Amino acid sequence: MAQNSVSLSAGDRRSRVAYLSSSHGDLSSSALALAMVSGDSFLVTRPEAILPEPVPRSSVRLNFRTESRRAPGGGRSPTRFNEGREMEARSRSRQARFSPYPGPAVKLDLLRSVLQQRLVALGGVIVARLSA
């Protein structure tokens, strides 16, 4: 079954404006503007006026796959980061993000102190029992 609805991106707005202004004289320009801003312009347009024939989904997916798999290694070429300004951006992007949880070194220090406190407490209990 063919699908009649068409999803539009922001780049398609120019053709929508031309179609809306030419064929919908009964709607005011403010109503058309409101429909476009609110994203409800599909209610006042026909999909055929924007895209004359439906785009096959398989070709869209194929293009997306070729784009995402174009360059092995994350899409970065070795010559891209030669300038100093781009090197700074690269080092900034590799900085650790803020986390509300302690890092590995802090976790180890905390674990060490808790174990030490428990060992001291256990030692105190043992000494108290031996002396009793």
Swiss-Prot record:
Q: Which Pfam families match?
A: DUF4687 (PF15747)
Which residue intervals are annotated with compositional bias (Basic and acidic residues) in the record?
A: 82-91
- Region Disordered, as annotated, extends over 65-100
Name of this chain's protein: Uncharacterized protein C11orf71 homolog
